[in-house]
Regions:
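ATP-dependent carboxylate activation and anion-phosphoryl transfer catalytic cores
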Residues: 1-131
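Structured alpha-helical segments in the cores of large, soluble enzyme domains
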Residues: 71-79, 166, 204-209
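A short, gly/pro- and small-residue-rich
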Residues: 161, 167-196
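Conserved small/polar residues in nucleotide/adenosyl-binding loops
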Residues: 211-213
């Protein structure tokens, strides 16, 4: 069965330029989130994207050699959509005991700082905790309160809020007055996997037609 995948890989390589052009065209048609991840299942005879996450938690798995490149891409995205941004506030999940997740947040912070941004971390839910224990050590949190529906971090207002919270429990307060990446409406409080597959299907059909499968 694995030969099917090998044959498909060869076809994709042959169609590389056409696929690249198709993807560039599709990216130009929709707003692209600052980050994201997909869950892929490979059964040996079929490969499928089974989920998409707009608030990924796997940055701690990135190799150190890739970090400068990713920091540059993140900076380019922020500069393009928020050219005056100097300060990014990272709004995390409240997973205070998940060291892997904490390390993910620490890595995002490092990428932002490598890109030249000031980066603070915290949320009203985590206010007063002080720090979280990550794999490489403690991650310092900044005091965050909601004042007039705006996030107040150490008495100031950040230029941009970077969400790393999938909003499973619903919308959080304090975001309305800020520019927020990714948009809060992409959280799980509104998204459905059935809708994800409906949107994905048309792209699947287009690419299959392009590569004649």
């Amino acid at each position: 069965m694995t030969d099917v995948i090998h044959e498909l890989a060869a076809t994709l390589e042959q169609k590389r330029e056409e696929i690249t052009a198709w993807m560039a065209k599709k990216r130009a048609e929709v707003p692209i989130p600052i980050y994201g991840s997909v869950d892929i299942r490979d059964s040996g005879w079929k490969v499928a994207v089974v989920d998409a996450n707009h608030f990924p938690a796997g940055f701690n798995n990135i190799s150190e050699t890739d970090e400068p490149y990713l920091a540059e891409l993140m900076k380019e995205h922020i500069d393009r959509l928020s050219p005056d941004c100097k300060w990014v506030h990272l709004y995390p999940e409240s997973h205070t005991r998940n060291k892997g997740y904490v390390e993910n947040v620490a890595t995002i912070k490092r990428l932002l700082e490598t890109g030249g941004f000031r980066c603070t971390i915290g949320s009203p839910e985590l206010d007063g905790i002080g720090s979280l224990n990550g794999i490489s050590g403690p991650l310092v949190l900044d005091p965050v309160q909601v004042v007039d529906e705006s996030l107040n971090v150490n008495g100031e207002s950040p230029d941009l809020v970077l969400l790393n919270n999938d909003l499973t429990e619903g919308m959080v307060s304090g975001l309305g007055a800020h520019k927020v990446f990714p948009p809060p409406h992409m959280g799980w409080q509104r998204r459905r996997k059935s809708e994800h597959y409906e949107c994905l299907q048309k792209y699947v059909e287009e690419i299959l037609s392009l590569i004649h499968i």
